[in-house]
Amino acid sequence: SIKEKICKIIEAKIGKKPPFCP
């Protein structure tokens, strides 16, 4: 999903999953 892609991008940038990502 788009949300999953955004989560992966953010995770790659900050090195951890954002709180709104499973």
UniProtKB/Swiss-Prot annotation:
SS bond partners: C7-C21
Query: What is known about the tissue distribution of this protein?
Result: Expressed by the venom gland.
Sorted alphabetically, the keyword list is: Disulfide bond, G-protein coupled receptor impairing toxin, Mast cell degranulation, Secreted, Toxin
Q: Please provide, alphabetically and separated by semicolons, the GO molecular function terms listed in this UniProt record.
A: toxin activity
Q: Name one GO cellular component term.
A: extracellular region
Q: What is its main location?
A: secreted
Q: Does the keyword Cytoplasm apply?
A: no
Q: Where in the cell is it found?
A: Secreted
The Swiss-Prot or TrEMBL record describes its family as follows: Belongs to the sylv/frat/paul family.
Q: What does this protein do?
A: Potent mast cell degranulating peptide without hemolytic activity. Shows potent histamine releasing activities on rat peritoneal mast cells. Its mast cell degranulation activity may be related to the activation of G-protein coupled receptors in mast cells as well as interaction with other proteins located in cell endosomal membranes in the mast cells.
What is this protein's name?
Sylverin
Native source organism of the sequence: Protonectarina sylveirae (Brazilian wasp)
